[in-house]
Amino acid sequence: MGLKGFAEGGIASIVAGCSTHPLDLIKVRMQLQGESAPIQTNLRPALAFQTSTTVNAPPLRVGVIGVGSRLIREEGMRALFSGVSATVLRQTLYSTTRMGLYDIIKGEWTDPETKTMPLMKKIGAGAIAGAIGAAVGNPADVAMVRMQADGRLPLTDRRNYKSVLDAITQMIRGEGVTSLWRGSSLTINRAMLVTSSQLASYDSVKETILEKGLLKDGLGTHVSASFAAGFVASVASNPVDVIKTRVMNMKVVAGVAPPYKGAVDCALKTVKAEGIMSLYKGFIPTVSRQAPFTVVLFVTLEQVKKLFKDYDF
């Protein structure tokens, strides 16, 4: 297969990532809801002496339409593409690697006689490809999360990254090179879940549709298989994605204890403070983004493969 699979997967991933970036940004904002420290208001009753009562205001939770509307109202239409340069770099590193490796592994593990590959092998191939791709693309992933989340912070706390390269440079200077791999274990776990469920589901659903003669090998089959794969990937990865987003977004200041000690600590604190369903926070925008992302990804991939079919590299 050589570099061909990497090029095909990379082109399709960049197109899909950029076209669904606003939905991904809304998902990140929703996943960070409820994370900030409660607002404290000192209330003094009319007949009180020199005492005060501290009231913790409950965290405001807003739905996907509310988050999107507030984002446009407060930050402008351009804010919907905050961090898109990081998305391009992330797809170039992460998705190009995982798509190319999956193609190579699938070619090696496919039965030469039947031209088929068992579901468990597809899942294994996806997990391996996803893990390696995530390790390569983690710096861009951290930068993307921070750039997408920056607008929700007070003006004095914003990082104001100019681009993905500026974000990476500032992280190295201020927090050390290891900050580029903050949350990498979560990124790898999420990538293994997403890639194995997404690519294996797509291949399996597509094969089933063609075998049963439900549809011909065309746009209808590609869209149907892609939509199913996107939903499966969303269900499998959302809990890890919430924790990953929070760990990557946390601000580390010298001499001050970070909000979370690690992934497990973040998960425990999140569930304790916001309930078990908080792990599926942002699920609607996740599905809303993952389904069209997967559809655009595989439909574009099928077309790119047709363009490259006469070329070998």
UniProtKB/Swiss-Prot annotation:
Family, similarity comment: Belongs to the mitochondrial carrier (TC 2.A.29) family.
Function: PUMPS are mitochondrial transporter proteins that create proton leaks across the inner mitochondrial membrane, thus uncoupling oxidative phosphorylation. This leads to a decrease in the efficiency of oxidative phosphorylation and an increase in heat production. May be involved in protecting plant cells against oxidative stress damage. Recombinant PUMP5, reconstituted into liposomes, transports a wide range of dicarboxylic acids including malate, oxaloacetate and succinate as well as phosphate, sulfate and thiosulfate.
Superkingdom of origin organism: Eukaryota
Subcellular location: Mitochondrion inner membrane
Keyword Magnesium: no
GO MF term list: dicarboxylic acid transmembrane transporter activity; oxidative phosphorylation uncoupler activity
Regions crossing the membrane: 6-26, 77-97, 123-143, 182-202, 223-243, 280-300
GO biological process, one term: cellular response to hypoxia
Ranges of the Solcar repeats in the UniProt entry: 4-108, 117-208, 217-307
Record's protein name: Mitochondrial uncoupling protein 5
Factors inducing expression: By cold stress and high light.
One CC-aspect GO term: mitochondrial inner membrane
Tissue: Expressed in roots, leaves, stems and flowers.
Chief localization: mitochondrion
Signal peptide extent: none
Keywords, comma-separated and alphabetical: Membrane, Mitochondrion, Mitochondrion inner membrane, Repeat, Stress response, Transmembrane, Transmembrane helix, Transport
Pfam families to which the protein is assigned, alphabetical: Mito_carr
Membrane protein topology class: Multi-pass membrane protein
